[in-house]
């Protein structure tokens, strides 16, 4: 059992910033097309965090042209270049699935007040 934990620790990334549900983040994906490589940015609200060792994931939701788009991001994937926290949100839940049914200004997350 100890061998598995050692291998998982070697595969984990250490450059992931701390964030929580409700925060707005930018995820920079490394896209390989043929021999070319480019970076694609996905910015949205974190609606779910699944914690784990190497299988930790987050679900990020954004509205694109009036359509809700959700993307499940494996945190320790080599295809994720880096993650950047844009702003912190004030929510009282850890899973924000209720945002899927809200439209317009009701779907906004209030910014966290820093005193």
From Swiss-Prot:
One GO CC term on file: cytosolic large ribosomal subunit
InterPro entries assigned: Ribosomal_bL19 (IPR001857), Ribosomal_bL19_CS (IPR018257), Ribosomal_bL19_sf (IPR038657), Translation_prot_SH3-like_sf (IPR008991)
Taxonomy, superkingdom: Bacteria
Example GO BP: translation
GO MF annotation, one: structural constituent of ribosome
KW Ribonucleoprotein (keyword) present: yes
Annotated keywords: Ribonucleoprotein, Ribosomal protein
Protein's name in the database: Large ribosomal subunit protein bL19
Family statement: Belongs to the bacterial ribosomal protein bL19 family.
Function text: This protein is located at the 30S-50S ribosomal subunit interface and may play a role in the structure and function of the aminoacyl-tRNA binding site.
